[in-house]
Amino acid sequence: MSRFPFPIPHGWFGLCFSHELKAGEIKKITLAGRDLAVFRTESGKAAVLDNYCPHLGAPLHQGCVVGESVRCPFHHWQFNGDGECTDIPYANRIPARAVAETIPLQEVNGMVMAWYHPEGREPYFELPKVEGLNGEDKWNELEYMDIELPTCVQEVAENDVDQAHFTYLHRMPAFSETETVVDGPIKRS
């Protein structure tokens, strides 16, 4: 088909649910063809770095979390969530260029989210906090379900705005009509 492949739109993408990333854990997650090292520090802060150590390219997800940093499995260089090298065990000083590439991250509404823009531009909007899902005002645990769809992001978005097709094509019960408000990149319905 001439429509494929679609470009990946820019915006915030879910890397994992917050409860899936325990303190001291590292996961390799691929976003838009790029491998990322997603980790939670010992104090509980989520962070995301390019998965490959800037020293010699070792996969950081195969390392371990030490305090507030991830330690490379090859030479034990350590990088914090801001990409700063915090330790080189055999060096007296850390070179200025020893910096891991970071990805903008937000942890909100029970999800660890990363920003993607094909031209590397910084985020131009924050994700809204949903009342009742965060911190002190959290009133209930969410239920989670993973669904794998053999499709692309654009088709998911197109289907979301074509509510009528669910009833006629997929033979699902009709959705109740709701008011939809679009405020910049945010859709509320």
Language-model features: locations:
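Rieske [2Fe-2S] iron-sulfur-binding subdomain
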Residues: 1-46, 80-189
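Beta-loop-alpha module in the N-terminal Rossmann-like domain of NAD(P)-dependent dehydrogenases
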Residues: 42, 59-62
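Short cysteine-rich clusters marking metal-coordination/redox-active sites
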Residues: 53, 72
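Short Cys/His-rich local motifs and their 1-3 flanking residues in nucleic-acid-associated proteins
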Residues: 55-58, 77
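Short Cys/His-rich "knuckle" micro-motifs
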Residues: 61-64, 81-83
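Short linker/helix segments within small regulatory modules
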Residues: 62-68, 95-100
